[in-house]
UniProtKB/Swiss-Prot annotation:
Range of residues in the leader sequence: 1-18
CC annotations in GO: cytosol; extracellular space; nucleus
Alphabetized PANTHER family for the sequence: LIPOCALIN, MAJOR URINARY PROTEIN 1-RELATED
Name of the molecule in the record: Major urinary protein 2
Tissue localization of expression: Abundant in the urine of adult male mice but absent from that of females.
Localization per record: Secreted
CDD domains in alphabetical order: lipocalin_MUP-like
Intrachain disulfide bonds: C82-C175
């Protein structure tokens, strides 16, 4: 019986791992990221961009997949007031990359997702000759496991973002009450 349970657990882990994808990989199915998401963690090599009142402290509510673009619906908090912000990200020539104009020119990819629970995004912003990067961890639910959060932190470090520049927003005002 124990062997059967271990076998089932092993097969479950293999199936879960096999379902992970990257927007730059051949197995990525953009349709599966359609729907509701929650911002869990933001990270940046310019921390001030994601701190309170930072221009990139955006709380994702929804991704709507179109043929060659994504409609992204966010909320921002300014002076404790929630505001809605929508933008359209267009596919670029590079596989799995999207671009959007917001406080500069941005390109982003989705290095990891399992579609059902989490999505990890990597964004590069260019404005006035300066560049910074931002990474986001998003969940289908308002919070994620510590294991997924740790995997995200390691991915941030691989991109040169220090742990002190990773902000867990799962307990912050993310305008959850403003969701329809």
């Amino acid at each position: 019986m124990k062997m059967l349970l271990l076998l089932c657990l092993g097969l479950t882990l293999v199936c879960v791992h096999a379902e992970e994808a990257s927007s730059t990989g051949r197995n990525f199915n953009v349709e599966k990221i359609n729907g509701e998401w929650h911002t869990i963690i933001l990270a940046s090599d310019k921390r001030e961009k994601i701190e309170d009142n930072g221009n990139f402290r955006l709380f994702l509510e929804q991704i709507h997949v179109l043929e060659k673009s994504l409609v992204l619906k966010f909320h921002t908090v300014r002076d404790e007031e929630c505001s809605e912000l929508s933008m359209v990200a267009d596919k670029t020539e590079k596989a799995g990359e999207y671009s959007v104009t917001y406080d500069g020119f941005n390109t982003f990819t989705i290095p990891k997702t399992d579609y059902d629970n989490f999505l990890m995004a990597h964004l590069i912003n260019e404005k006035d000759g300066e560049t910074f990067q931002l990474m986001g961890l998003y969940g289908r639910e308002p919070d994620l496991s510590s294991d997924i959060k740790e995997r995200f932190a390691k991915l941030c470090e691989e991109h040169g973002i220090l742990r002190e520049n990773i902000i867990d927003l799962s307990n912050a005002n993310r305008c959850l009450q403003a969701r329809e």
